[in-house]
């Protein structure tokens, strides 16, 4: 075992040769390097697979031995200061290593096909491999300085990947927004690290925990300053994990390629913030009010993310807000001190979310064959629908990922989310009510995404429908955007609500019109042969096997990964692998490791949480599933939506909710007005002060000198006798004044 741990330092550097060799190859041998691009993709997958095997071996040893291994090299700079570099292998590290490598391999395999026709194929794989290196270095770091170095590298890689298609203004703006927003958190992280070094004199985690605990116990430290430093550390996690109020970069990050979205949202960048809080949890526990702040930020984020996902039209942005909400659950669990629940949800959420993003990429890929390369159209759920018969494998995988995120047993997220909900009742009933309500919202918006994407008819082909048997009824939608329409009985309600009629659209105040030449569009930034004018398709088609294989593997993880945390410890049967895995870290937190639960208590709690999820699913199915065809012989819809004052009032309320959700809670607009506008106003004021005051003084002195010189030049005639006469005259005047003043 010791022999294996000794070589763990190599883990972050295994994927590093790929970006280095690609960079050197493109610089020295560009043609040959581009011709061998599939070879570089193979090596990217191969090297990350080696890291995965190594990580699995380390994890097995962690489970069997319940030990923590740390190795440190000391770099002595002088007698007063030495910098220690090393690596730390504990349960948290091994969990993150497996998440990063397994999800990363699936994304790399998927990307080989998804990015195959992109001119930046090699650049993409270089960025991805360096991203993996940065994240692996982050999770194996043994001190705060190493964490900060790799933290910044992760931020740099995310900037490059979000702005991968930098020629698109939206992508360029999105990567800048992510970069600037994360700089705010990174500044807090740096100040917090320096503050704790000033207090403790060490960057090492163990020294930090012990010294701070002793200082607080002996009342030898200023608690206010200590709390401020802890809040600054937490600010770094808030920005990186897209927690309120620094969450605004996450939806815009969807401008990058879809495989990047899967990697960022499942196992890398957003998980880094959760990892940091989990790593520093022994420190946060002993500092007053920090856990309360963490849980408060978590509960706000999970509710805000769920509500903002309700009205999004872009499939990737909807999933982005879903990620934000689920990260809020993890942060809430950490704030409650539920270390096991938070990491359990981190594991179970990673695979379904990667599955959903890769599934959405498959949907987008198939839609581009119809609408061309236009993210506004290929990612717009208004134009989708009826994809079940066109992409059946993608549909099945996406459906299972949706069920998992909704918390339906026995899929992965059910086990972890149910555990967080149970812990929340013990922590705060108010927080528990919000968390349970958000679970219902999660089921609602996830099934909304699924139904709009796969059920009904392909809306991009729908123009107008006319039939023989028509009836009039008031079209309903969640957002009260309906009107009196003529509808054929044999046509679905959902298709009707997305038509280009005079009344408002199902999703916005303005009708979404489809260009007549939409199928003749080509990619402005990619060259894909079957997307040209010669080979167009009337309907989407299923992705190739290279893209489907990762989906199927992630389906297996989604089905079975929750089994590692099943809390049934009966006589002669110990199924709780996760608690055994996390026992060293839980012992460090001085928490009770006994997590057993009898069947009756578990089933009772599970029925409640699953009932909430099913309630959200039923509401989503009623509003979004094309049920009208099955109710065509009943007049339920017309009787349900009678017009009147109550209906009008309800529509107004729903419109307000819709506008608030669709406009991201007006938070981006507030930041643009207050922060961006304020900084711009300050810049204009500074420019005015610089040009009018500073430059005015400098230029004024020059102008005054010029006029004084000119005046003197005209007074002087060039005769010395005149100068002497003026000099004596002035001296005489001053003498007379002095004489009269002294009388």
From Swiss-Prot:
Q: Work out whether the entry's keyword set contains Membrane.
A: yes
GO biological process assignments: ATP synthesis coupled electron transport; electron transport coupled proton transport
Which InterPro entries does the record match to this protein? NADH_UbQ_OxRdtase_chlpt_su5_C, NADHpl_OxRdtase_5_subgr, ND/Mrp_TM, NU5C-like, Proton_antipo_N
Q: Tell whether Metal-binding is among the UniProt keywords.
A: no
- What's one Pfam family here? Proton_antipo_C
Q: What is its EC number?
A: 7.1.1.-
Keywords assigned by UniProt? Chloroplast, Membrane, NAD, NADP, Plastid, Plastoquinone, Quinone, Thylakoid, Translocase, Transmembrane, Transmembrane helix, Transport
Into which EC class is this enzyme placed?
A: translocase
Can you tell me where the transmembrane regions are? 9-29, 40-60, 89-109, 125-145, 147-167, 184-204, 219-239, 258-278, 280-300, 396-416, 425-445, 548-568, 607-627, 723-743
What GO molecular function terms would the record report? NADH dehydrogenase (ubiquinone) activity; quinone binding
Membrane topology (UniProt): Multi-pass membrane protein
Catalytic activity, reaction form: a plastoquinone + NADH + (n+1) H(+)(in) = a plastoquinol + NAD(+) + n H(+)(out); a plastoquinone + NADPH + (n+1) H(+)(in) = a plastoquinol + NADP(+) + n H(+)(out)
Explain the purpose of this protein: NDH shuttles electrons from NAD(P)H:plastoquinone, via FMN and iron-sulfur (Fe-S) centers, to quinones in the photosynthetic chain and possibly in a chloroplast respiratory chain. The immediate electron acceptor for the enzyme in this species is believed to be plastoquinone. Couples the redox reaction to proton translocation, and thus conserves the redox energy in a proton gradient.
Q: Which family does it belong to?
A: Belongs to the complex I subunit 5 family.
Protein name per UniProt = NAD(P)H-quinone oxidoreductase subunit 5, chloroplastic
């Amino acid at each position: 075992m010791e022999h294996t741990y000794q070589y763990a330092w190599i883990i972050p550097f295994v994927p590093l040769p790929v970006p280095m060799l690609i960079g050197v190859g493109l610089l020295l041998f560009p043609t040959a390097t581009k011709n061998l691009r599939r070879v570089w993709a193979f090596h990217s997958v191969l090297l990350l697979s080696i890291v995965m095997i190594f990580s699995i071996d380390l994890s097995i040893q962690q489970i069997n031995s319940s030990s923590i291994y740390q190795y440190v090299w000391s770099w002595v700079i002088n007698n007063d200061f030495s910098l220690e570099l090393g690596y730390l292998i504990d349960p948290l590290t091994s969990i993150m290593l497996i998440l990063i490598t397994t999800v990363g391999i699936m994304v790399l395999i998927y990307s080989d096909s998804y990015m195959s026709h992109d001119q930046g194929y090699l650049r993409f794989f270089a960025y991805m491999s360096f991203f993996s290196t940065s994240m692996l270095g982050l999770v194996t770091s043994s001190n705060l300085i190493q964490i900060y170095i790799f933290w910044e590298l992760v931020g740099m890689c995310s900037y490059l990947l979000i702005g991968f298609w930098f020629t698109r203004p939206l992508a360029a703006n999105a990567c800048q927004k992510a970069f600037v927003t994360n700089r705010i958190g990174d500044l807090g992280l740096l100040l917090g690290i320096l503050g704790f070094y000033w207090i403790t004199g060490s960057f090492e985690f163990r020294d930090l925990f012990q010294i701070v605990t002793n200082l607080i116990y002996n009342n030898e430290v200023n608690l206010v300053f200590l709390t401020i430093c802890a809040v600054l550390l937490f600010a770094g996690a808030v920005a990186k994990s897209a927690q309120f109020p620094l969450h605004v970069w996450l939806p815009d990050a969807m401008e990058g390629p879809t495989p990047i979205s899967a990697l960022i949202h499942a196992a890398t960048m957003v998980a880094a913030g959760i990892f940091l809080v989990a790593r520093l949890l022994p420190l946060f526990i002993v500092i007053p009010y920090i856990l309360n702040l963490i849980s408060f930020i978590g509960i706000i984020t999970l509710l805000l993310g769920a509500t903002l996902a309700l009205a999004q039209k872009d499939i990737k942005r909807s999933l982005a807000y879903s990620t934000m909400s689920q990260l809020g659950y993890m942060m809430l669990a950490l704030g409650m001190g539920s270390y096991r629940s938070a990491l359990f949800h981190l594991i179970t959420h990673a695979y379904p979310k990667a599955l959903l993003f890769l599934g959405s990429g498959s949907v987008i890929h198939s839609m581009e064959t119809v609408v061309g390369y236009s993210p506004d159209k290929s990612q717009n759920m208004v134009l989708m629908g009826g994809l079940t018969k066109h992409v059946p494998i993608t549909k099945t995988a996406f459906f299972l990922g949706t069920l998992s995120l909704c918390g339906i047993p026995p899929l992965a997220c059910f086990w972890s989310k149910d555990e967080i909900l149970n812990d929340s009742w013990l922590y705060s009933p108010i927080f528990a009510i919000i968390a349970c309500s958000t679970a219902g919202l999660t089921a609602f918006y996830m099934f909304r995404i699924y139904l709009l994407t796969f059920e009904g008819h392909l809306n991009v082909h729908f123009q107008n429908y006319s039939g023989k048997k028509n009836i009039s009824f008031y079209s309903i939608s969640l957002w009260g955007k309906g009107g009196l329409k003529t509808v054929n009985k044999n046509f679905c309600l959902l298709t009707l609500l997305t038509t280009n009629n005079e009344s408002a659209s199902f999703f916005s105040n303005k009708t979404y019109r489809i260009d007549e030449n939409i199928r003749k569009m080509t990619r402005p930034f990619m060259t894909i042969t079957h997307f040209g004018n010669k080979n167009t398709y009337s309907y989407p088609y299923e992705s190739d096997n290279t893209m489907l294989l990762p989906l199927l593997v992630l389906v297996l993880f989604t089905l079975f990964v929750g089994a590692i945390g099943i809390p049934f410890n009966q006589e002669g049967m110990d199924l709780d692998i996760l608690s055994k895995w996390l026992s060293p870290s839980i012992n460090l937190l001085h928490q009770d490791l006994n997590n057993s639960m009898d069947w009756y208590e578990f089933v009772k709690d599970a029925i409640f949480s699953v009932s909430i999820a099913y309630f959200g699913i039923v509401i989503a199915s009623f509003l979004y599933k094309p049920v009208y065809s099955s109710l065509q012989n009943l007049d339920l819809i017309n009787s349900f939506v009678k017009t009147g004052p109550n209906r009008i009032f309800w529509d107004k309320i729903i419109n307000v909710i819709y506008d608030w959700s669709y406009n991201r809670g007006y938070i981006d607009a507030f930041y643009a007005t207050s922060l961006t506008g304020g900084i711009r106003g300050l810049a204009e004021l500074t420019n005015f002060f610089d040009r009018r005051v500073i430059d005015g003084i400098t230029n004024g002195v020059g102008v005054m000198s010029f006029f004084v010189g000119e005046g003197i030049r005209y007074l002087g005639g060039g005769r010395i006798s005149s100068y002497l006469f003026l000099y004596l005259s002035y001296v005489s005047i001053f003498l007379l004044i002095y004489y009269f003043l002294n009388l």
